[in-house]
């Protein structure tokens, strides 16, 4: 079956995170000739497919089969793919069943390869993302079979197919600062300790502050305020406390400890508490890595353009490969309609993505 037909079959599965809706079984049957391991954790389905061609490098393709809910307002059934004007319309068309279809077909058709090809698929990426790719990699490590290189087929292209490869991602740290005061009557401010006034005195040194100046592939790590709450929504009572929520998308130059240290410095002298949660660490694959160089060459061979190397965007499962020391890149179709109503992907992009992956496999040594 050609790659677009496989994509259409995958799009029929109502695999709203974390349910795979049977997609994993379909993929396992389609990929005959590959050894299969189902790694199911806490109700999450993960599938690892492996085929050894020779004693060379182990190259892994990875992706997720789960999608976000479709919502209302679609022009067609979001789980009945429709081909119109060269586009395939359905939930998951761009994010990321197109990438999955492309690497499934490229791996299935592979003949010229002197190593091991593997595929990691999960139904837990759009949700919590903690029982998916991470667990699959733990399983492979326990078997002594971690890949040497990996490609995650997320939709990375910005405006033109082939224009962007992701070679890293910023980290993400969420924080909550609560300043405690003394509640009282607004007419007697001298008898109160107003935490909002305390916040106001330091707010300009906290909101939007750049913790570093960035680097070649990362912008500055900036404190972004996401919410401020305090008081009882009445005009004559001062607040007992004020809560400030913030997020930092951090580069490799700023750690969670650095964020903690700066926040404590700013609010020093106040009665406050601080809670930080690091949901992902920043990572960067060296631009001289074999996976980066060969991905660039394959894109240039098929797309006739030179892709930019980028670390923009949110978090992805590529971070788990980096955590295990596996050099990883991300590459896929244009991402202009991900998570949107009437999500769609160009049929020609899916076909070209298959050719890029096929070229990568055939020329990877």
From Swiss-Prot:
Catalytic activities: N-succinyl-(2S,6S)-2,6-diaminopimelate + H2O = (2S,6S)-2,6-diaminopimelate + succinate
Pfam families in the cross-refs: M20_dimer (PF07687), Peptidase_M20 (PF01546)
InterPro entries tied to this protein: ArgE/DapE_CS (IPR001261), Bact_exopeptidase_dim_dom (IPR036264), DapE_proteobac (IPR005941), Peptidase_M20 (IPR002933), Peptidase_M20_dimer (IPR011650), Peptidase_M20A (IPR050072)
Cofactor(s), by name: Zn(2+); Co(2+)
Residue positions binding Zn(2+) 1: 64, 95, 154
Catalytic residue positions: 66, 125 (proton acceptor)
Residues the record lists as binding Zn(2+) 2: 95, 126, 339
Keywords for this protein: Amino-acid biosynthesis, Cobalt, Diaminopimelate biosynthesis, Hydrolase, Lysine biosynthesis, Metal-binding, Zinc
GO biological process, one term: diaminopimelate biosynthetic process
Assembly mode: Homodimer.
Assigned protein family: Belongs to the peptidase M20A family. DapE subfamily.
Protein name in UniProt: Succinyl-diaminopimelate desuccinylase
Gene source species: Campylobacter fetus subsp. fetus (strain 82-40)
